[in-house]
From Swiss-Prot:
Domain of life: Bacteria
UniProt modification remark: Cross-links are proved in vitro, when coepressed in E.coli with the ProcM lanthionine synthetase. The lanthionine residue has both a DL configuration (with 2S,6R stereochemistry) and a LL configuration (with 2R,6R stereochemistry). DL and LL diastomers have a 4:1 ratio. It is unknown whether nonenzymatic cyclization occur, but authors favor a model in which ProcM does generate all thioether cross-links. The beta-methyllanthionine residue has a DL configuration (with 2S,3S,6R stereochemistry).
Main function: Lanthionine-containing peptide (lantipeptide) with unknown function. Does not show antibiotic activity against Lactococcus lactis 117 and Bacillus subtilis 6633 bacteria. Organisms that produce this peptide live in oligotrophic environments at very dilute concentrations, suggesting this peptide is not secreted to influence other bacteria.
Modified residues (2,3-didehydrobutyrine): T65
Cellular localization per UniProt: Secreted
Cleaved propeptide residues: 1-64
Chain positions of cross-link Lanthionine (Ser-Cys): S67-C70
Record GO cellular component, one term: extracellular region
Keyword Secreted: yes
Main localisation: secreted
Protein name per UniProt: Lantipeptide prochlorosin 4.3
Length: 77
């Protein structure tokens, strides 16, 4: 299971503005970006993580609380 890899990648993204910029690019391939950064995650891992977002995380992604950046759901805004 790649859950640990996904969590590690999310932590890396939160600390690395270069990765954040890559993920913000239109059509960004999150799986490929993660692989290039040394992580093994799948599209299924991402989809599963997105389905398990809390209401607060969803509100943040929708622009309700955050002012910009990448959050733990792998959405950049």
């Amino acid at each position: 299971m790649s859950e640990e890899q996904l969590k590690a990648f999310i932590a890396k993204v939160q600390a690395d503005t270069s990765l954040q910029e890559q993920l913000k690019a239109e059509g960004a391939d999150v799986v490929a970006i993660a692989k290039a950064a040394g992580f093994t995650i799948t599209t299924e891992d991402l989809n599963s993580h997105r389905q398990n977002l809390t209401d607060d995380e969803l509100e943040g992604v929708a622009g309700g609380t955050a002012s910009g950046g990448c959050d733990t759901s792998m959405f950049c805004y």
